[in-house]
Each structure stands twice: as structure tokens, then as C-alpha cells.
A protein has these predicted regions:
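Catalytic machinery of carbohydrate-active enzymes
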Residues: 1-199
Length: 199
């Protein structure tokens, strides 16, 4: 069984844009185990994404802040798995070093840093036709699997307690709620086109 590590300690939207990568890995390796390293604030975002089996919380602002915090995180997880590959979103140097220390056999990231790039198993990336961030994230899987990237929609498993919260608090005394989505961001590469919205 393959075991993968996905590292993204960015913000809410960035986490969601990583989901197609997780889904692509599961599409190619359906029986694999995928560990997602997330910042504490957005751990629930990762926890309920399709394709994610386990979430490790990297509390970069408190518990795991700085070099000592980095080392403590490593000690907490150092013998948990033997990772076949790690996928580091946005070429995060901390994620690359951590993946190496955790023993990932292959590491894929988009980093142009001269010294850090030596730790990667991919050459500088040419995304070709992939210009949207979620597709570029997914392309990292192709570098490992050699299976062509498929532009997958994001899929999120909303927990039942979230529905209960919305019903009891947010929709209290509202008989006909309206839900609006705003798929537009300040960066065109992150905008969600109609078929790319959650399914």
C-alpha cells in the first residue's frame, strides 16, 4: 500500500485548492493512505476533504513555532509512516525539509530555491496548459504517478454536526434560506469556473 504526505499550512482557500491533488492520488492509488499536514486553524478543512485519510496539525504560530517547534513536530511523527512520496504545496521550504526528515522517498514541489531544489525529485516545473492553482497542485501527482493530470472538481464531505449548527444557529427563524457562492478572487488563477465548484 502506498503512503503519501501532502503538506499545506496555508489559508482556507489554499487548502481547498489542494483537494484535487488528493483526489488524483486516490484515483490512481485507491487503497493508498494519505496524510495531510495542515495548520491548526484549518485542520477541519483538510479533515473532511475527499481523499484525505489522516490529518497532522502543524501549529506554526504556537506549539510548532520556530526551529524548536519544528523539531518537536518531527519527534511527534518521525516513525509514524514510511512515505512513498510527499507533495509540498507552494514549495514551502519548511515542508520540504520536514518531508526529508520524515523519510519521504520522493519529494515533489514547485521551488526554484537553488539549494532547496536539490532535495526534490522533480526538475523545475513547466505546467503547460495548467494555469489554475488547483490544476497546478494536481500536476505534482503526475510527476510521481506518470498518469496524466485530470482536472478534478473539489469534493468536501460536510460533517453532520455542521448541518446541525447551520440549522440551529444560522437558519433559526428563516423559512427559505438563500445560499450564494462567490467563486471570484483577486487572482484569476484561483477563480473557480462553474464546472469546478464543489460536487
Amino acid at each position: 500500500m502506498k503512503t503519501f504526505l501532502v503538506y499545506n499550512t496555508s489559508f482556507f482557500g489554499d487548502m481547498i485548492l489542494t483537494n484535487p491533488l488528493c483526489r488524483q492520488l486516490k484515483r490512481v492509488y485507491p487503497h493508498s493512505h494519505l496524510v495531510f499536514i495542515s495548520d491548526k486553524t484549518y485542520a477541519d478543512v483538510a479533515r473532511y476533504m475527499d481523499g484525505v485519510d489522516e490529518v497532522w496539525i502543524y501549529d506554526k504560530h504556537k506549539k510548532h513555532k520556530g526551529i524548536i517547534g519544528f523539531y518537536n513536530f518531527y519527534k511527534e511523527h518521525k516513525n509514524a509512516y514510511s512515505f512513498d512520496a510527499a507533495f509540498i504545496i507552494y514549495g514551502n521550504e519548511r515542508g520540504i525539509f520536514l518531508s526529508k526528515l520524515l523519510g519521504a522517498k520522493k519529494i515533489y514541489a514547485d521551488s526554484t530555491h537553488k539549494y532547496v531544489h536539490r532535495l526534490l525529485d522533480n526538475p523545475p516545473i513547466n505546467y503547460g496548459k495548467w494555469y489554475q492553482i488547483q490544476d497546478q497542485n494536481t500536476y505534482l501527482a503526475e510527476l510521481y504517478t506518470q498518469v496524466p493530470t485530470e482536472s478534478l472538481p473539489m469534493k468536501y464531505h460536510v460533517p453532520e454536526e455542521a448541518f446541525a449548527y447551520v440549522d440551529s444557529i444560522l437558519l433559526k427563524d428563516i423559512h427559505k434560506p438563500i445560499v450564494a457562492l462567490n467563486p471570484i478572487t483577486k487572482n484569476k488563477e484561483k477563480d473557480l469556473k462553474r464546472p469546478r465548484l464543489f460536487i
